[in-house]
A protein has these predicted regions:
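Residue-level detection of the helix-turn-helix DNA-binding "recognition helix"
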Residues: 20, 34, 45-47
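Sensory/regulatory domains in signal-transduction proteins
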Residues: 83-185
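A short, Lys/Arg-rich alpha-helix, primarily the initiator
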Residues: 1-20
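Short, basic/aromatic recognition patches
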Residues: 67-84
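Key DNA-contacting residues within the recognition helix of helix-turn-helix
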Residues: 16, 30, 41-42, 51
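Short alpha-helical DNA-recognition segment
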Residues: 23-41
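DNA major-groove recognition helix of helix-turn-helix/homeodomain DNA-binding modules
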Residues: 49-71
Length: 185
């Protein structure tokens, strides 16, 4: 798989939520992106797509970061869990935290994978589910329902995925960015 999803969801709703949480006016957001205020409005309304450069700027702005004590507590809960689970940025799929059981499946040390996107290891079933998230309102709401699906398997030795039932739960972090808890059931 490539480093990023084949189907990149519009970032307008997330940008609007980020602006509201951080009390950023459209005019200031326009300055950050180097565009007109009306462009920000069209992005947020879903009327205009971002260019690749604008999207990269938005992804840097909206990417999940473990900034607060609560965010770090969530990462510690995942890292201390007996279950097979990991936490990724919902937007970039960068690995934020991982349980020992999940880390034991990897052929590289966890320290080498933390902060890197796991998308390249996605199975076709994971790609299909990622694409279907838009129709479920996954990116439009702060706390959509969890989704469960069969993952299929990949042939990776670095991050092997064996066919199993998986649950994705989207969580909003303290800065308004979204993380995804990935659990093997």
């Amino acid at each position: 798989m490539s480093a990023s999803p084949l189907h990149a969801p519009p970032l307008g709703p997330q940008l609007k939520r980020w602006r509201a949480l951080h009390r950023v006016k459209q005019s200031h957001a326009a300055e950050l992106f180097g565009v007109a205020q009306s462009t920000i409005s069209r992005w947020e309304a879903g009327l205009q797509q971002m260019s690749p450069g604008e999207r990269a700027t938005a992804e840097r702005l909206l990417a999940a970061r473990l900034d607060s004590a609560g965010d770090h507590a969530l990462a510690r809960l995942v890292a201390g869990s007996a279950g097979r689970m990991h936490l990724v940025c919902d937007l970039t799929h960068r690995l934020l935290a991982c349980s020992p059981a999940r880390a034991a499946e990897f052929s590289q040390p966890l320290s080498m994978l933390l902060g890197t996107s796991l998308w390249r290891y996605a199975t076709p079933a994971i790609v299909r589910m990622e694409t279907a998230l838009d129709t479920l309102g996954w990116h439009d709401r702060a706390g959509p329902p969890s989704v469960e699906f069969d993952t299929g398997a990949n042939a990776s030795r670095v991050v092997p995925i064996r066919g199993s039932l998986c649950r994705w739960t989207r969580m909003t972090l303290s800065d308004g960015s979204a993380a995804r808890l990935v659990e093997t059931l």
